[in-house]
Structure formats: C-alpha cells, structure tokens
Amino acid sequence: MKQALSICGVTLISALLLSACQTNDSATSQTNSASSSLTQSSESNSNAMSNSTEDDSFEETSKEESQPVDYTYQVNPAIFTIEPLNEEDDKKVALLTIDDAPDQHAIEIAEKLKSIDAPAVFFINGMYIESDEGKETLKQLYDMGFEIGNHSQTHANLSEISPEEQREEIIKTNELIYETIGVKPRFFRAPFGVNTDTSAEIIEQEDMVFMNWTYGYDWEADYQDPKALTDIMLNTEYLNDGANLLMHDRPWTNDAIIDIAEGLKEKGYTLIDPALIASPEREESAE
C-alpha cells in the first residue's frame, strides 16, 4: 500500500537571507538547517542527504494522477532530502528540480533532460501560466513526463503577506495548473524557502508535501556561468545521498543542465523519478 508523507510540526527558524530567484539581488550560499523548519530559510541555503531509484519509464508513471503508484521514497520534512521508505531501496539518489518555470528556458531544459532520461520536478509560478503561451508551455512540460510542482503565484515572500494573500498565492496556482493539465500539484516549494504556519495549514488542506531543497547556487553571480555552475553542483560538500538540487529557469542553468545530470550519474547517483515520492493526495486517488 502506498505510504503517505505526513507534514510534521516544526520549529521556526528566522534567517535574513537573499533571494535565489530575483536576479537583481546579491546572494550568498548558506547551508539549510537540519532542524524541523517550516519558516524562513532562503533560496541561498545549502545542505544535503538522500535516497531513491531511477525509472526509465518516468514519463508514463508521472503523467497520470489517477494511475496507481507504488511509492518507494519520501521527502524528509526536516531537511528535505529524499529518503527510501524501505532499507533495501537505493539510498544514493539525487532529485533535480527547476524553479521559476516556465520562464524562457523551461522547454529547452526539459528537452535536454528528456534526451538523457533524467526526470525532474518543474516548480511553476502561476503568473507564468496565465497567458495562452504559458499554458501551452506547461502542457508541453507535462506531456514530456515531468512532475509539476507549485512555486506560488507571484513569488511573494509568504512571511510578509497576510494569511488571505498566502492562500491566494498557493490556491490560485493550484487552480491554474489543474485547469491547464488536469492534475493538481503534489509538491509545494515556497519562494525563498520561507514557509509559515498559515502555508503549512493550506498545504495540509490541499494534501500536498512541502519540498524545499538541500543546495543550489545558480542565482549567485559567481555561478552564473555553465562551467562554474557545473563544477559547484557536482563537487560541493552538500552533495550527499538524497540530495535535492535547486536550480532555476535561467540561461546558464540551461547550458549546464546536461553536464550536471550526467555528472551526478558518473558519481554513482540515481536520478530519482518524482513519481516515486510519496504524497497524501496521490495515495488517496490511487486507492
């Protein structure tokens, strides 16, 4: 039977960090706290651990919400690594995620990943799929077999807006995604990694799973170059079992994505199919 991931109650961590997704801000890299955080942890946080298995048929298994899925992995709610549900399953796994999609390079990134059988989650900002062009891009990503996640409507810092506005940021994007592809997102990634008590309640009501990350660098000026980005993503101390890699819909990430994915494989990591990661919504629909 499928196993659902419950959202843990957790303590608040305040950290004034810089925007990972806003290119006008300067940024520095920090390690994600390994505490049970549902609050402020910016997109410049870094840290890792892991678990999972690669499935060459990830395109088929991730496309249908109603399709029965045998979950073998879960998101660690404290440190956001990907961990096996059973001891015998592969622990040396890594998850690829792309935030701020679909901006200008999402389709190119997706096509490159698909060409090397590398699954990923594309985290969607609702503001990008209000237009017909944005909706068509989202459909293409979904039709290529990629998991679609919710990254809020306007990339607002949830800790700086009202509970009503937080609900709008999450629910509106869920509705836009569902209207476009007929599937509700299973994973939510808060802008800047800043979760709140209110967002936790909404995510629970929506049967979703919080998914921050363990490390990422592509918003920092020093790594806005394909070679530099590839090097740090493959050689950082935070690359460990269950690594949850944060990247963005950016030109340098587009240029580096194949080398990053292939480099992870060369280091012995299995690129996990997000369809194998547990969520309460998908488990209920499969029963």
Residue ranges and their predicted role:
Residues 1-2:
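N-terminal secretory signal peptides that target proteins for export/translocation
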Residues 6-11, 21-96, 102-111, 115, ...:
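N-terminal pre-catalytic segment of deacetylase/amide-hydrolase enzymes
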Residues 16-20:
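C-terminal motif of bacterial Sec signal peptides marking the signal peptidase cleavage site
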Residues 102-103, 154, 251:
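Short, glycine/acidic-enriched loop or turn micro-motifs at the edges of active sites
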Residues 238-252, 256-275:
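Catalytic grooves of carbohydrate-active enzymes
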